[in-house]
Amino acid sequence: MNVRRAVAPVLVGACCACTAWAANLRNIEVSRESGRYHLVADTHLAAPPEAIREVLLDFDNDRYQRISEIYKESGYLPPDNDGTPIVYTRVEGCLLFFCRSLRRVERVEVATPNLIRTAVLPDRSDFKYAVSEWHLDPEGNGTRLRYTMDLEPSFWLPPFVGPWFLKRTLLHGAPQAVDKIEELAQEAERPTQEGGGATANADTR
């Protein structure tokens, strides 16, 4: 398995370029402090926020495999006691000779239509701590997608897996996932646009 593609799940867990603006991964920053990694990514996607949100929340029936082949399982579990949705993902990846299957069970909160928050349940995951936020803001004919994550794995990582190595790796592998998210969002939006066009045509008769 390619290390550059497989390392992404360690941090990210967590994208038909047929429009004027293709997906544009503007920036990725990775830092580490006291064993905890911090990731910030800034992207433009040529699709509306509601379509991107639909893709990001579509965990059922292992459908996260559509975003990246590193996802082996994904789905919704029974909700938490307060009714908050809980999702499960499992990814497989290798860092050179170091290979693992990584589980994450997370609470998913749609705080606003354009803000998704997640928080890992450590006793059911391979991470001591992990929280993330997806900010989806309208921008031009598409969406500015800002992603932040703080993560502390509960397993040993080789010493060479530092911020510089992870940033280089993510810059190599992340654009494909970003392009796929954009493509899936455009596909989800297309039936709506076609339906609206059909209605408009009917009204002019």
What residue ranges belong to the model's regions?
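N-terminal secretory signal peptides that target proteins for export/translocation
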Residues: 1-3
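Hydrophobic ligand-binding cavity/cleft-lining segments
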Residues: 18-84
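Glycine-rich portal/gate segments that line the openings of hydrophobic small-molecule binding cavities
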Residues: 32, 36, 44, 74-124, ...
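Beta-strand/loop substructures that line and gate deep hydrophobic ligand-binding cavities in soluble
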Residues: 120-172
